[in-house]
Regions:
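Extracellular jelly-roll beta-sandwich "head" domains, especially the C-terminal globular C1q domain
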Residues: 2-150
Length: 150
């Protein structure tokens, strides 16, 4: 069939291998492109935003966005719950939120979140990983994968 999508030509992988302190309410900057993005996925290196484009003949394009990484309270922070979430158009998705409660600062936890995001034909949607905590969070070895699934 002509409309059958094939593997890696419909996915992209963005990462930040450094440990980054992300302020409350801010997005994680993605500094490396491990797998080059197709035309329906756009990203500027160093930006925290990834743009999904509704380039499709159907009513909408569907993407699976997943994030994995390690999070901790940075030195000088207050011990308590910290959280990160996938954000669509700047709004955090409660269904794609990871919350951990470290016992001490610099105590890293591995987190993973994923969501399906639908983009209407001809439209664009931005996605990011957002610090939804009330304080700065250290994020290390982060990896955001975007797959065009339909």
């Amino acid at each position: 069939r002509r409309f059958l999508m094939k593997g890696a030509d419909k996915m992209a992988e963005f990462s930040n291998s450094n440990t980054v302190s992300v302020a409350a309410g801010e997005n994680l900057p993605l500094t490396e492109t491990a797998v080059k993005a197709p035309a329906c996925i756009m990203h500027r290196e160093g930006s925290g935003l990834v743009t999904l484009r509704g380039l499709t003949n159907q009513c909408k394009a569907r993407f699976k966005v997943s994030f994995g990484g390690n999070i901790a309270i940075p030195t000088g922070g207050a011990v308590g719950p910290i959280s990160v979430a996938l954000a669509v158009g700047g709004e955090s998705l409660t269904s794609a939120t990871a919350i951990v409660t470290p016992a001490a600062v610099e105590n890293y936890f591995n987190v993973f979140v994923a969501a399906f995001i639908e983009v209407p034909r001809g439209c664009c949607v931005t996605v990011a990983l957002k610090n939804t905590s009330t304080q700065a969070v250290s994020i290390a070895n982060s990896n955001l994968i975007v797959e065009r699934v339909a």
